[in-house]
Amino acid sequence: MDFAELLESKAFTRTRLPLSKPIVVHAVAGAGKTSLLENYARINPAARIYTPIAQQSNSLLLSPFTQSLEQADIVDEYPLSTLHPGVEYVLADPIQYLGSKDLLKPHYICPTTHRFGHSTAEFLTSLGIETYAHKPDRLTIANIFKTEPHGQVIACDLDTQQLAARHSLDYLRPCQSIGKTFKDTTILISHELNRDTLTKEIYIALTRHTNSVTILTPDAPSTSS
């Protein structure tokens, strides 16, 4: 099985863009890119796959990733790398790289996540990011000054990072949470969240959980789904 056949077997859909090298694969957070690459490495042990981001794989296999970008024919998180002419496929979650001049138009896409659930997927869709899920989860929006954090705290901007530090919270910045997954998360945002105020940092924070996410903002009405 070649990589294109594997993509299609995992519900990655071809776009109308004519194929050209490198073939670009875009997927929402939690769509299973790492599992896809591990499966391909199992089928094709000679595959040379590169990622610039440390991976936390649950696979019993040794990591399929090579340390050499120059020898890779598949590159994950490609906006972080300088691509050489021999690269066959490149992959990324494009929303994590909003505004990057290195984003390419995709030949394959997957808007379905296996990480979080319907409530978060519907919320992301309301923010303009088409997302689907196969399971339930819980999303709560509450006031940052009236609600205790639950699970891993992710502070999305300087104001909330300073607030978290003053309260001695064990928090992560969004960039520190890339490649990580938690059962429950609380994300701190210093402003109202809507399509106009959504940033890649907030998107990253919104997509780290498997069970529940609590969004804390100033003066937010308490809602849950």
From Swiss-Prot:
GO terms for biological process: symbiont-mediated suppression of host innate immune response; transport of virus in host, cell to cell. The keyword Plastid does not apply. Residues 1-110 form the (+)RNA virus helicase ATP-binding domain. It comes from the Viruses. GO terms for cellular component: host cell cytoplasm. Keywords: Host cytoplasm, Host-virus interaction, Inhibition of host innate immune response by virus, RNA-binding, Suppressor of RNA silencing, Transport, Viral immunoevasion, Viral movement protein. One of its GO terms (molecular function) is ATP binding. Pfam families: Viral_helicase1. Residues 111-225 form the (+)RNA virus helicase C-terminal domain. It is found in: Host cytoplasm. The keyword Lipoprotein does not apply. Transports viral genome to neighboring plant cells directly through plasmosdesmata, without any budding. The movement protein allows efficient cell to cell propagation, by bypassing the host cell wall barrier. Increases plasmodesma size exclusion limit. Acts as a suppressor of RNA-mediated gene silencing, also known as post-transcriptional gene silencing (PTGS), a mechanism of plant viral defense that limits the accumulation of viral RNAs. Homodimer and homooligomer. Interacts with capsid protein. Interacts with host AGO1; this interaction targets the host protein for degradation, thereby suppressing the antiviral RNA silencing. TGBp1, TGBp2 and TGBp3 seem to act together for cell-to-cell propagation. TGBp1 is the main movement protein that physically cross the plasmodesma with the viral genome. TGBp2 and TGBp3 would facilitate TGBp1 function. Belongs to the Tymovirales TGBp1 protein family. This is Movement and silencing protein TGBp1. It comes from Indian citrus ringspot virus (isolate Kinnow mandarin/India/K1/1996) (ICRSV).
